Amino acid sequence: MLDALDEHDYLISTTGLISREVFAQGDRTRNFYMLGSMGLASALALGVALLRPNARVVVLEGDGSAMMALGTLPLVAAERPANLTHVVLDNEAYESTGAQPSISDRVDLGSIGEASGYMRVNRVSSVDGMTAALPAGSPAGPALVVAKVVLDPLLRVPPRVSLTPQQIKARFQAALAENTVAVNEA
């Protein structure tokens, strides 16, 4: 999924293992790693999308994080940021805190996105499906991608993000201050 990002895209990733994996896969100044703030990634992404309407903004969070702040989904839909793609990695667990089961096996997050008013909702369960759901450029959003995933228990746990929250904030603010490329120019 990270390969689908353009150098001008902003990525906000939720706390825990998702931010750790994003950081390990390739740190960028336009990545904002939420450290210790579960459930707030989508709200931050909405703010970035509204601030920078000509840049694609992707938020990456788990099912536990998304369910902690379900009220953000209708807020995102009401604001209608065409440049926002909201990706939920749904493994039906709070993986970062010990893999306790979540309730997403009984809650259809895609249907909640549709009922909230997201312009596009995709449900995927493969890498090919994820690639198709994240097209180059950014068709009218907001878009929600709910990806059912299964974690391999033998995979290594990525190292912690080595930046301090202050460093993450400062460099992301600097990236926001840079000129951005329009979504459809890429």
What are these language model-derived features?
Residues L89-A99:
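Long, charge-dense
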Residues Y10-T15, Y33-G36, V59, N122-S125, ...:
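General beta-strand structural signal in soluble alpha/beta enzymes
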Residues Q100-L134:
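Conserved thiamine diphosphate
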Residues E21-N91:
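Thiamine diphosphate
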Residues P139-A186:
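Glycine/aspartate-rich loop-and-adjacent alpha/beta segment that forms the canonical ThDP
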Residues M1-E7:
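Active-site pocket-lining segments that scaffold enzyme catalytic pockets across diverse folds
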Residues H8-R28:
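Acidic-glycine-rich active-site phosphate/pyrophosphate-binding loop
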